[in-house]
Amino acid sequence: MAVKKTDRRAAKTQNAIFTALAELMTEKELRHITVQDISDKADIHRVTFYKHFLDIYDVYEQLTKIILCEVGVLLTQHGEKTPATFYYDILNYVSEHTVYFKMIFSPHNTSRLYQNILKLFIGYEGLFLSEQFGPDYPESVLTCVIRYHVNGCFAVIADWVTTGLERPQEYIVKTLSELDKSIYAYLRSQQA
């Protein structure tokens, strides 16, 4: 029983550290953040920080792995859902983890995490569209459309996050879903 309590406390501390790092990365670059900055922001002692992580870069790496893993799980369910349901799930995840996405879209963040999430989306979109349109579909058209589509979706989501989620989630879902219809119509027109 005591082990579960300790694990829960450890998880709470790690989440506080992750959140502190994310908030700080909206203000300054990773290389300018200190353990003391995180400790102050998370309201923990430095010793507590070092019980969980080696250094700032270890925190960033672990947070990156968690985000990529969770986003990857969402993407694997893409083909099973309508575009509206898929976008709703993605935007739910983003709104539940806004602090991390503010970090991801911050000019102070290294572009590595952003690029890795982008690659995940591009890869899954490629698999999804290949299944939809078959292996004989012109790869050059798919590649161009996938990059356009994923980067466009990211731009809309980044704007939504950086403006404090001021537009209703339903509006973003509807907009992205409607744009998808145009993209799919274009892809079908190129099959002939």
Language model feature labels by segment:
Residues 25, 35, 49, 56-67, ...:
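Amphipathic alpha-helical segments enriched in hydrophobic/aromatic and basic residues
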